[in-house]
Amino acid sequence: MTKKTIQASCRKNKLYLTPHLNDVLYLHYSGYNAIDGLDEYVGLKCLWLECNAISNISGLDHQSQLRCLYLHNNLIKKIENLQHCKQLDTLNLSHNHIAKIENCGSDILPVLNTLNISHNYLKSIESLAELRKCDFVSVLDISHNRIEDIAIVKVLADMKGLRVLTLVGNPVVNDIPSYRKTLILECKSLTYLDSRPVFDKDRACAEAWKRGGYEEERKEHQRWKKEEQRKMRRSINATLRLRHRGDGEPELLKTSSDEEEEEKEGSAAGRGDFEELEYQSNDVAWKEMEALFNQHTKGDTQQAQKLAEERKASTNSVDYITGSDSNSDPTLVTDCDSCVRNSSRACSSRSDTSDSEDMFDKIVPKKHRKLASSMRPEVSLSDSSSSSSETEDEAGSILDSKLDRQNTITEFIDEYKRFFHSVDLRDPKCVLKNRHKIVRPQTAKSQRTEPIVYEGVLKAMEQNSNGAKIEQARQERFEANERSLAKEAVLERLMKGHAEVDMNIEQQMISIGGKQHNFNEYRLEVFRQDQEKLQNLIDRVTAQKEKYNAHIDSIHDQLANIMEDYGQISEKLRKVDDMIQNIGDEVVVHQEKERDGLEVIQELEPITIAEQIVENMTKEQVPDEVEANDKASDATIDPVDQLSSDESAIDLGELNQHVDAQVEVGPSDPKDATTSKPIPEEFGSDPVYRKFIDIQYEIDKLTEDQIFTALSEAARELQEEELETKLVHDAIDEYWSTDLEDFRRNLNLDAHPIVQRFKRFIECQGTDTDDTDSEAHVRRLENAYHRYERRLSNHLFDEYLMLSRKASIATTTGGESSATELELVELDGGHVLRASTSRRATAWDLKETVEDPVEELEELNEEEDPALKEAGDFKHDELEDEESKPEEKTLKSAEVLGMQEPLADVQGDH
């Protein structure tokens, strides 16, 4: 890193060429091994040095304003030389070789906020003790290190400002019980752990787990879940209220069952008092109705005034219950209310029955609290005062007004229906929740009427109006909700999910390719097909695995054989090295003796030395030649002995070269024990030892380069031989897996010509047989069977040898295959009754010729009739051919050759 390279980097990244004007510098991916040349860059705030070969931190003495330093993917082993960077906020040292955190406490880096030391070599608690001094570090990444000590939890707990922690990839993560809960409890300010944030719910559940275990944690989780659902519901209801502002109260979301239970428990006492008071007020209203319909037709003014006062008192009690007094808020009047009022004006009369109570409260009895007089609009003080004066004037004409209006009840029933269009009858709490907003339609005091007085009206109204009309109103309200598609219904369906959808698709018929199929049958059929495909794949993989394992085993066996051969070769080479070392020591001793006794050596003539060496060697070789001649005369000559006898016959030219080499080196003193070491008897008669002596003389004449070249060529030849051996073994393996299997599969003994001929022979012999000569016939068949069996085995063996010609190389090179592994086609021997107790010929019994019959068969043949014997022999001779005696000729030829070779050797010696 030089000033020139730094300026080139600035030019490349379009930075300032004036050093102190740059606040950021990009020196990453540059191959630097040290930090240098930054003295003039005093205004740097961000320095990028990642992906280099920096081994230590240095050269930052003038970077007092540095805020961010990126040194990841380097070769740093120690944190040092950062005391001048007092304003450093972010330090990235990941993917380095740091084994200990040091020199980064608050005394050196007082404002350090983010520290990344992931993918390093931190292991013990001592290497992390410096973190206790990092008071202002809020983001710490120590992932993918080698931390194993569980005490790291206490170190992290001492970091009061820690907010974000990444600890994944360390062995200690698996050792900490309840890893996430433990760290949340220990690190009080933690907001992000590994790859997930830490919410208040997680911390509350962790604290509950600490208090009472998993059961307490489950309860805390349920409590948080309910609270979240409650907040969501409140938010949706608030949104619905804002949307329907001015249109009346919207249909809001219902609370869950558990919240309803809590609300019921909380409001049980108040609701009981309300029902009691409401019942009392309704009881007073019914008594009032009875008195009204049972009064005399003339109408008494005083009694009417008394009844009006009683009704006023009951009305005031009801207003007290419903909160509709003069001090309450003004009620909202909807469009439906205006419509009802207009209709009520059309059917109004000249007088009214009371000042603060309409006919709806008297006509409809108490069956639902929505039908009671609790939904009464407030009445101002001026209205109440004026109504009291009007009651006195109109009390006398009550009966006349009732008789004039015959259709008043029907009109009020219609008004009752229109009223229920604006009330949600499905919500039993509608009266309590909406008592200040949803109001029953009113009629003006001057337009109110009294019901017609006739017998049985109360009974008829109770039977007809109470149940049927309420049910009809509910049905109309339900149909209206379905037509309007209210927001509450849509949200309710979204909250409940697909409760009304028929999900039983297994019983439905589906159409595939234009045909109807049962879902269960189609699914089972597809499952069977997938299972068959999977099973076929498993079988293929298993077969491939078995084949691969067999191939690996064969390779291991071949390697074992090769290593065994190499061991034998190395042992022989070690012996050769020992012999060469002994010969070298003798040569050194010869040179020393040559310097000491130079005069004595000069007196000896070279011809004399050569003659002595030749004489000694000829003496040693005479017994070997005689022994070789004796072995050559034998018919069964051992190949190893022939090789020794051939090698013992040393060429005359090689002998002269050996003599010349002895002359150059000089003779050794036979009396000196150090110069002439006794040769072991096993090497004295070994021609290989003599050959190695000659090779040693040739090696001494070569230079080092020539020796190296020769060894290289030998190594290359060994590699080529090894490669050829491998190819041969591969070909053999292929043969065993293909050709031999084809041979066995295609082998059909019934169709073999020899077997066909044997069957025809049996048919011929079976046509002219009598009971008298049955034993002779059995013997003839037995003899023919032996001959045909031997002939068939010879044929099959010849075919097998033709197929196994590839494997002959492996048997000679010491490979995997051998003669014992050749699974020859063999006809197992058996025993037959009576004369067939002799062992039958097989493919391995080739040495057994036709001329060596079984003794029992010979005895039986001698007892036969001469005429039958001649006839049988004639038939056997017809069937006999040259193929039944293949080894007889080979043995005779081998004996002839064995007799000729010793004669040739003796003549050559002479």
Curated annotation (Swiss-Prot):
LRR repeats lie at residues 43-64, 65-86, 87-108, 111-132, 136-157. Residues 314-331 have a biased composition (Polar residues). Residues 217-230, 620-633, 866-878 have a biased composition (Basic and acidic residues). It is found in: Cell projection, Cilium. GO terms for biological process: axoneme assembly; cilium assembly. Residues 380-389 have a biased composition (Low complexity). Gene3D superfamilies: Ribonuclease Inhibitor (3.80.10.10). Residues 855-865 have a biased composition (Acidic residues). GO terms for molecular function: dynein complex binding. Residues 217-275, 297-332, 344-399, 620-642, 662-682, 855-910 are annotated as: Disordered. Keywords: Cell projection, Cilium, Leucine-rich repeat, Repeat. GO terms for cellular component: axoneme. Residues 171-209 form the LRRCT domain. It holds the Pfam family LRR_4. Cilium-specific protein required for cilia structures. PANTHER family: LEUCINE-RICH REPEAT-CONTAINING PROTEIN 46, PROTEIN PHOSPHATASE 1 REGULATORY SUBUNIT SDS22-RELATED. Belongs to the DNAAF1 family. This is Dynein axonemal assembly factor 1 homolog. It comes from Anopheles gambiae (African malaria mosquito). The lineage of its organism: Eukaryota, Metazoa, Ecdysozoa, Arthropoda, Hexapoda.
